[in-house]
Amino acid sequence: MTSTSPRAFGVRSMTAPLRRAVLRIPAAVGDFEGAGWRPPDARLLLSQHERLAGLLEALGVEVIVLPPLGGLPDACFVYDPVLVTGAGAVVLRSAKQVRSGEAEPLAAELEALGVPVAGRLTGEARADGGDMLWLDERTLLAGRGYRTNAEAHRQLAAILAREDATLERCDLPHDRGPAHLLHLMSVVSPVADDLAVVFEPLAPVPLLEELRARDVRWIAVDPEEYATLACNVLAVRPGVAIMADGNPRTRRALEAQGCEVHVYQASELSKGDGGPTCLTRPIHRSG
């Protein structure tokens, strides 16, 4: 698509209209087992990713598709290596060793797209973007678990303070342990200012209390559909969302709340346990 503001950037919302987003073509070859994937069909994996990009474009998003990154299977999950704020990209440091080479290349690609580096985690700080979501334009909620540590919280709070934003902390459960993925956004996806989807059995109590305090209603995802990523829903704009196909109960519940729901075929993309929010790095939301 052609953008009217080709270098526009800034994200301080999970549901404001998505103007620009980055996706990365999945690696067709690589150590999928070492990265924790179930073996995908490479041809279908690439086709499904292309169709997801096309769906976003059809919904009015300017999509920039980046090339595969050095045979790294997880590199297609572009939400995790950086956090985009109102000031630019904060370069994160992954606690998953096989993802340690993703952040700096993505930061350089974003700079070429007009998104400046607003900060970098250093030293012992470790964090994934999947542990972070904007509660409002001045408040970032960050999970504390096996992927994001307390030192990252400390450094992120200092970076956010430079743009008059604050960080709230939320401890995550052990679930199945450090070898298995559990991000904050594994258990919650905002869909509109007053609506989210939540997997209650793993949702931290402070998260639910925060949603209630903000008058946010939520749809409770059941365990069967949680396993097929029904809790991973990307808001394109308030009440318009993208989710993986094969989750009819959650889809119907969203539609009953007045949402417009679009689905994509995800049989291969989901083999790395990532949904549309993981596969999409918003770089500009506004309106």
Question: Where do the protein language model's features map onto the residues?
Answer:
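The feature marks the mature, well-folded catalytic cores of soluble enzymes
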Residues: 2-287
